[in-house]
UniProtKB/Swiss-Prot annotation:
UreD, UreF and UreG form a complex that acts as a GTP-hydrolysis-dependent molecular chaperone, activating the urease apoprotein by helping to assemble the nickel containing metallocenter of UreC. The UreE protein probably delivers the nickel. The gene is ureD. Disulfide bonds: none annotated. GO terms for molecular function: nickel cation binding. It comes from Rhodopseudomonas palustris (strain ATCC BAA-98 / CGA009). HAMAP family: UreD. It is found in: Cytoplasm. Keywords: Chaperone, Cytoplasm, Nickel insertion. Required for maturation of urease via the functional incorporation of the urease nickel metallocenter. One of its GO terms (cellular component) is cytoplasm. This is Urease accessory protein UreD. Its main location: cytoplasm.
Length: 279
């Protein structure tokens, strides 16, 4: 009988089962109407445009893989050209599953040209226990571009009473405005991360965090947002510097975080949130 070489079976099988997805979207202004430019889709990522082209265009990002697993690689690029307007959300919360392999890689690039506006409003990212994910968010804005961005991360399936005990989450944000770096931050949680959650400087006992970023933003906007904060169930800090405003949340559960985030975004946007947020 001929011998079979199985030395690479495990690694080859793991690599073959990993999902890869890419989406690149360009939108352009044409006579006051925002229209789709080139759209590129590959692998398990898709983008859909549920509303007709009008003053602002809405888009929905869909992950047909049903979630994110170790070793997956996803790339999203949005290019909002001069005076165009785009709002993008996701079809559902993104789940990052447990893995004993390498971390999933998520690469997000957001570019907004002069007079353009982007609302990047994905639903929650839920990290299962022993999930491993590394995310990069790179933002490039013209001096007079505007941005409304939200990100929410849930550590464990809180609705099922599960808290993330071990895993890895690296979140790297960089924002440039007019070619100048105006915001840079990297969050790094690795290993026994549950032991960090109780620390006041980390999560202070919470299991859900959120960030809302508003450009441009000033002291007047901060005061308007703080007027709503007295009713929040989550801890929140709101401030402005370098021409933008930011609200940071830490909550005991995902539902509380989502409700408070919706209030902040509604005030910042001055218009209704995507319908998928309300379902």
């Amino acid at each position: 009988m001929m011998a079979t070489d199985t030395s690479l079976t495990t690694s080859q099988t793991f690599a073959a089962n990993r999902a890869v997805g890419e989406v690149a979207v360009e939108v352009r202004a044409d006579g006051g109407v925002t229209r789709r430019g080139p759209v590129h889709e590959a692998g398990s990522l898709r983008v859909r445009f549920p509303s007709p082209e009008q003053q602002g265009l809405s888009a929905v990002l869909v992950n047909t893989a049903g979630g994110v697993a170790g070793g997956d690689r996803f790339s999203i690029s949005l290019d909002v050209q001069a005076h165009a307007r785009l709002t993008l959300t996701t079809a559902a919360a993104e789940k990052v599953y447990r893995t004993h392999g390498p971390a999933a890689q998520l690469d997000i690039k957001l570019k907004v040209a002069s007079g353009g506006h982007l609302a990047w409003l994905p639903q929650e990212t839920i990290l299962f226990d022993q999930a491993r994910a590394e995310r990069r968010i790179d933002i490039e804005l013209a001096d007079d571009a505007s941005l409304l961005l939200s990100e929410m991360v849930i550590f464990g399936r809180s609705a099922m009473g599960e808290t993330m005990q071990h895993g890895r989450f690296v979140d790297r944000w960089r924002m440039r405005r007019g070619g100048k770096l105006v915001f840079a931050e990297t969050v790094r949680l690795d290993g026994d991360i549950a032991s960090l959650f109780g620390r006041p400087a980390v999560l202070n006992g919470g299991v859900a965090i959120g960030t809302a970023l508003i450009v441009p933003g000033d002291a007047a906007l901060v005061e308007r947002l703080r007027e709503a904060a007295d009713t929040f169930g989550a801890e929140v800090g709101i401030s402005a510097w370098n021409g933008f405003a930011m609200a940071r949340f830490c909550a005991q559960n995902a539902a509380r975080l989502r409700a408070d985030m919706m209030t902040i975004l509604g005030r910042a946007a001055g218009r209704a949130l995507p319908r998928l947020w309300l379902s």
